[in-house]
């Protein structure tokens, strides 16, 4: 029996538009609720949300069998950390601040068993292999790994074509906020030079045959990124949605006469 098929990876490769949402509460119950909305993918955020290995593992568990595919964003691309979340059952990783083809190649290798990589083979301890109940897991897992790298600096943009040429990079996610900050526009990704850079990057990603991803929260920007070619598009953040709805509801009834 082989490793479970990563249907998100195959959908990305086909160019389907996949709509996602950030799961930032670091809580399995909240992530399970979010999955009932039917998003194609959910980011379990280990970079800016208060997640650790146990909370990530718990969220992976509640998403098993759900339509929403878990994308685990790690705080960094360290091989030991990659190994742990893959053993916990993740198949798709989003790695921030990738700025070179060399970094991308190292990430590809960290996600794969030898001879294609350096992932440790302790699968008997791992949920990923159903605790050794999938006899062919190690032999087949490499083909189901999906690597998404974040390009969010000028250095990353300069190296984009080389990153896209790395075998094993399934998609590139543009980080508008950090890119804008690195270009001298802290907190304002709407500046013309930032927008032009994003549009060009998304086009180059799709031309290279890779999936292009990005996050936006307002309707106009979401439509613009979609029209520019983004095909794994995050359209919400759960923490933001709760905060906005809570404030709007209270404001409405405080002022109602």
From Swiss-Prot:
Increases basicity of active site His, annotated site positions: 87
Coiled-coil ranges from the UniProt annotation: none
Catalytic residues of the enzyme: 48
Any one Gene Ontology cellular component term annotated for this protein: cytoplasm
GO MF, one example: metal ion binding
Keyword Signal belongs to the record: no
Record: residues binding a divalent metal cation: 152, 178
Top-level taxon of the source organism: Bacteria
Entry keywords, A to Z: Lyase, Metal-binding, Pyruvate
Cofactor(s) needed: a divalent metal cation
Catalytic activity: D-glyceraldehyde + 3-hydroxypyruvate = 2-dehydro-D-gluconate; D-glyceraldehyde + pyruvate = 2-dehydro-3-deoxy-L-galactonate; 2-dehydro-3-deoxy-D-gluconate = D-glyceraldehyde + pyruvate
Job of this protein: Aldolase which can catalyze in vitro the aldolisation reaction between hydroxypyruvate (HPA) or pyruvate (PA) and D-glyceraldehyde (D-GA). The condensation of hydroxypyruvate and D-glyceraldehyde produces 2-dehydro-D-gluconate as the major product. The condensation of pyruvate and D-glyceraldehyde produces 2-dehydro-3-deoxy-L-galactonate as the major product and 2-dehydro-3-deoxy-D-gluconate.
The name this protein goes by in its record: Hydroxypyruvate/pyruvate aldolase
């Amino acid at each position: 029996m082989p490793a479970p098929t990563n249907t998100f990876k195959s959908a990305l490769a086909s160019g389907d538009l996949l709509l996602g949402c950030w799961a930032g509460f670091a809580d399995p119950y909240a992530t399970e609720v979010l999955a009932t909305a039917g998003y194609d993918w959910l980011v379990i955020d280990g970079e800016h949300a208060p997640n650790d290995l146990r909370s990530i593992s718990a969220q992976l568990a509640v998403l098993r069998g759900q339509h929403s595919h878990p994308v685990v964003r790690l705080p960094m691309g360290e091989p030991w950390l990659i190994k742990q979340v893959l053993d916990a059952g993740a198949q798709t990783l989003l790695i921030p601040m990738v700025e070179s083809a060399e970094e991308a190649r190292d990430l590809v290798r960290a996600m794969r068993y030898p001879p294609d990589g350096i992932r440790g083979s302790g699968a008997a301890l791992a949920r990923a292999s159903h605790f050794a109940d999938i006899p062919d897991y190690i032999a087949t897992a490499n083909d189901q790994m999906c690597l998404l790298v974040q390009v969010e600096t000028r250095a990353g943009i300069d190296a984009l074509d080389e990153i896209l040429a790395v075998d094993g990079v399934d998609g590139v996610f543009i980080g508008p906020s950090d890119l804008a900050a690195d270009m001298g526009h802290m907190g304002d990704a709407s500046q013309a030079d930032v927008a032009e850079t994003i549009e060009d990057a998304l086009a180059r990603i799709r031309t290279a045959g890779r999936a292009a991803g990005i996050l936006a929260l307002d309707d106009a920007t979401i439509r613009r990124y979609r029209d520019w070619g983004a095909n794994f598009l995050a359209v919400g953040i759960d923490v933001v949605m709760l905060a906005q709805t809570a404030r709007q509801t209270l404001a409405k009834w405080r002022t109602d006469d």
